[in-house]
Amino acid sequence: GDVYKRQDMRYPEIAELTCMSLFQYLPYASEKAFEWMADDREYFQLCGFMLMARLLMKGNQLTERSEAEFLDQAMATLQSEGVLPRKAAATALKKFAVQSKENGKKVNRLLAPLAKSDKVEIASLAGEIKLETEYWH
């Protein structure tokens, strides 16, 4: 996975397609998702959150420890400057939140302060995630 990202991950569309059609099938996909989400490089974070979103869409469940790590990374990324990782983190949070009512409540509790953010793009993303969560529950 790292080899692909070092070479041609200059466009978000390529990153998305690669996550959806290749990375999700790796036996170590979950480990890579966490590694990439924690990376400081924009396209690594983008791939990490996209991959996590895909794994969650497939029904993968997180352990208590991995859930805490995921939520921590996603919330930090939502407040970061990188637009692409921020949107990918929001997508992954949506997929996590709609897995169960309990997950939805956890995410909405974490998002409550962000919904009141002075930064319009952050407040908007928080509202978008909340709406999608409420729609599915």
PLM regions and their residue ranges:
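Alpha-helical scaffold repeats of the Armadillo/HEAT/TPR superfamily
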Residues: 7, 65-73, 106-117
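Structural detector for internal amphipathic alpha-helices that build alpha-solenoid repeat scaffolds
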Residues: 14-25, 46-60, 87-99, 124-132
